[in-house]
A protein has these predicted regions:
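Intrinsically disordered or highly flexible coil/loop and linker segments, enriched in small
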Residues: 10-19, 42, 57-68, 97-99, ...
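A glycine-rich phosphate-binding loop feature that marks nucleotide/adenosyl-phosphate handling sites
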Residues: 17-28, 67-77, 90, 128-143, ...
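Extended, well-folded interaction surfaces typified by the phenylalanyl-tRNA synthetase beta subunit core
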Residues: 1-69
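Short, glycine-/Ser/Thr-/acidic-enriched flexible segments
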Residues: 18-20, 37-38, 58, 73-77, ...
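Hydrophobic alpha-helical scaffolding
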Residues: 4, 37-45, 61, 80-81, ...
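Conserved alpha/beta core surface patches that mediate binding of polyanionic ligands
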Residues: 13, 45-91, 169-184, 223-235
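Short, hydrophobic beta-strand segments
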Residues: 1, 31-35, 84-104, 140-144, ...
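A carboxyl-terminal module marker
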Residues: 103-235
Length: 235
């Protein structure tokens, strides 16, 4: 899953396993006896607070498109028993393609989040989720694979966004890694032996000619070798 997230544009981060007790939704918090600071006083029950801090840090440094993920353990207590859960969490915020002349006004939405989840774990299903501490109650979904609950996703709640001083909408997912079984019938494509080649193409066309039609013609004549087209400028 980590490799798949990197391929579709996510960057991996690593955060402390300690968070503020304000971001815990249980009474069975695992308190740290001598915390290094108040905002690192309990063992984390989710990776999302750390990722939210990453988003806040990057947005304050003029990063307009953010797609991050983290893979790690969360820590829980059930009565006297302490146990760990392996989690993979991803988060996205900002513009989908800030350098693209056409797409630079499009911001990430929940549909982009769902598409990313489906690209790394096909055949998952989504159901409404009303009981999450981290997600907005009207924009939260549970993730199922073969009728098994494997995680949740949605738009981060406004209260949590305010805690981290984030203005743009933030979307995230958390997946229980141990509940995912690999498909034995999965098919794999051979990786190309040739390096990627980037080309700048200048086209002179009538003003009435639609750009999307031009892109479509280029795609159809690329013999499936071309992976992506971006419009850099119009003059």
């Amino acid at each position: 899953i980590s490799d798949s997230l990197v391929i579709i544009g996510y960057k991996e981060v690593v955060n402390f396993s300690f968070i503020s007790k304000n971001y815990s939704n249980t009474k069975n918090q695992l308190l740290i006896e001598n915390p290094i600071s108040k905002d690192k006083s309990i063992m984390r029950e989710s990776l999302l607070p750390g990722l939210m801090n990453n988003v806040s840090y990057n947005t304050k440094r003029q990063q307009k498109s953010i797609r991050l993920f983290e893979k790690g353990k969360t820590y829980h207590r059930n009565n006297k028993e302490i146990y760990e859960i392996n989690i993979i969490s991803g988060i996205l915020s900002g513009y989908k393609s800030p350098t693209d002349l056409v797409l630079n006004t499009y911001k990430y939405g929940i549909d982009d989040l769902k598409a990313d989840i489906l690209s790394i774990i096909p055949n998952v299903k989504f159901n409404v989720n009303r009981d999450s501490i981290y997600f907005d109650s009207d924009n939260s979904l549970k993730i199922y694979l073969n009728e098994t609950l494997i995680g949740e996703c949605g738009m981060i709640s406004s209260s949590l966004m305010n805690d981290f001083d984030i203005k743009d909408c933030v979307f995230a997912f958390e997946i229980f890694e141990d509940k995912i079984s690999l498909d034995p019938n999965a098919a794999y494509k051979e990786i190309s032996q040739f390096p990627a080649v980037y080309k700048d193409i200048t086209v002179v066309a009538n003003k009435q000619y639609k750009i999307l039609n031009l892109i479509d013609k280029i795609h159809k004549n690329s013999y499936k070798y071309m992976k992506n087209i971006r419009i850099k400028d119009i003059f």
